[in-house]
């Protein structure tokens, strides 16, 4: 049934609109904070609305980069970046500390500066540009966790570099070095010095490395080719985590990020990773979205909830605040593809023929796959 209609660019734009339009009324007066609820998290309350603000960028940025727009949002974000990074503003986000949640959130801002500077940098006044640049550089003075967080300084300093701002090349090199040290083979990384092999591999480590592969293709062609090769290998294993109905394994941390489970496939399209046909990849992504949207994942105001198939605080981590689920918007990186990209015209196709049993050695997992369900044994 999924291939019966044309899932063109407009289909994905409409999905994104459905997710972000209900948020518009919840921004602070200057736009730097997004207030979505009253549950707490393991970090400072003042960072919670900043997280909400930043995470929506995972969806808006590729929309803007691909030539799209949702009325009013680019103005909110230019104003919000100005206020959030101005120490004299009442909406200032505050400085950083070791292990700060804001390190995660400035990665989304950096993504925006890399892909959509016309919306997030060029409209800013000279003073606002100086403040934003200084704010991002301030984060360079702090150590980040030795896991997927190592890629945040990489994105921050790539963004600064792309805007001809002072940046720290050492932090880019060191982050990429650490990423290489996490590599296990067959496309798999570990998320730091740990046994964790969960969705942070596709929606964090691969996701960031594929952004790098796209934006640094001319500056660092060898490494970019390597990142794409690893993603190709990973895709052949990760596909086993999805069943023919679009559902993915309920496994590991941060399950409230829901359809971020498909972000890897979207990032492969963005970075021109050639592994399965456009039709197969479109089928995986579309079935996944359709499956999610059949479930009550938003509240009655259209805001994504903490939970999984339905609102459920038992499915949260200590670091999940009301804005956290918008990490799921990473799945929309495919909107950065130009309108004429062949993906938009491709027909959604079913999964290819997969083995009934598959040993994913680096993931320490055996998958039993019979089409309409995937079961993992770990």
Task: Place the predicted regions along the sequence by residue.
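Short, glycine-/Ser/Thr-/acidic-enriched flexible segments
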Residues: 272, 333, 372-374
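Conserved small/polar residues in nucleotide/adenosyl-binding loops
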Residues: 378
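Non-catalytic carbohydrate-binding regions of carbohydrate-active enzymes
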Residues: 235-262, 268-316, 320, 339-364
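Aromatic-lined, polymer-binding surfaces characteristic
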Residues: 46-52, 58-63, 77-266
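Low-complexity, Ser/Thr/Pro/Gly-enriched N-terminal "stalk/linker" regions
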Residues: 2-51, 75-80
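Long, hydrophobic alpha/beta structural blocks
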Residues: 327, 333-336
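Short acidic-hydrophobic surface loop/beta-edge motif
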Residues: 366-370
């Amino acid at each position: 049934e999924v291939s019966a209609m044309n899932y063109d660019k407009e289909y994905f734009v409409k999905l994104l609109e459905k997710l972000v339009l209900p948020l518009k009324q919840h921004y602070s007066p200057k736009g730097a904070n997004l207030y979505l609820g009253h549950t707490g998290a393991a970090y400072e309350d003042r960072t919670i609305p900043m997280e909400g603000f930043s995470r929506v960028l995972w969806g808006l940025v590729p929309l803007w980069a691909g030539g799209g727009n949702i009325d009013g949002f680019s103005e909110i974000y230019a104003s919000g970046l100005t206020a959030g990074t101005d120490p004299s503003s009442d909406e200032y986000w505050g400085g950083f500390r070791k292990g700060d949640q804001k390190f995660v959130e400035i990665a989304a801002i950096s993504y925006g500066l890399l892909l959509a500077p016309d919306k997030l940098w060029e409209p800013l006044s000279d003073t606002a540009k100086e403040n934003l640049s200084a704010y991002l550089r301030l984060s360079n003075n702090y150590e980040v966790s030795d896991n997927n967080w190592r890629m945040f300084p990489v994105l921050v300093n790539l963004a600064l570099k792309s805007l001809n701002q002072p940046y720290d090349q050492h932090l880019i090199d060191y982050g990429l070095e650490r990423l290489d040290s996490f590599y296990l083979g067959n496309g798999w990384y570990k998320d730091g010095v740990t046994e964790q092999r969960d969705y942070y591999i596709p929606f964090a480590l691969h996701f960031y490395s594929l952004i790098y592969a796209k934006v640094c293709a001319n500056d660092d062609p060898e490494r970019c080719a390597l990142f794409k090769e690893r993603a190709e290998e990973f895709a052949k294993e990760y596909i086993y985590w999805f069943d023919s109905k679009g559902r993915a394994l309920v496994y590991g941390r941060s399950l409230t990020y829901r359809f971020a489970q498909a972000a890897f496939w979207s990032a492969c399209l963005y970075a021109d990773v050639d592994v399965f046909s456009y039709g197969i990849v479109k089928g995986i992504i579309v079935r996944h979205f359709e499956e999610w949207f059949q479930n009550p994942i938003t509240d009655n105001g259209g805001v994504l909830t903490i939970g999984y198939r339905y609102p459920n605080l038992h499915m949260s981590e200590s670091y999940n605040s009301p804005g956290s689920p918008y990490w799921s918007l990473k799945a929309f990186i495919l909107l950065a593809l130009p309108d004429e990209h062949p993906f938009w015209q491709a027909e959604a196709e079913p999964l290819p023929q997969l083995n009934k049993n598959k040993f994913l050695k680096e993931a320490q997992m055996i998958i039993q796959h019979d089409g309409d369900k995937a079961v993992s044994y770990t």
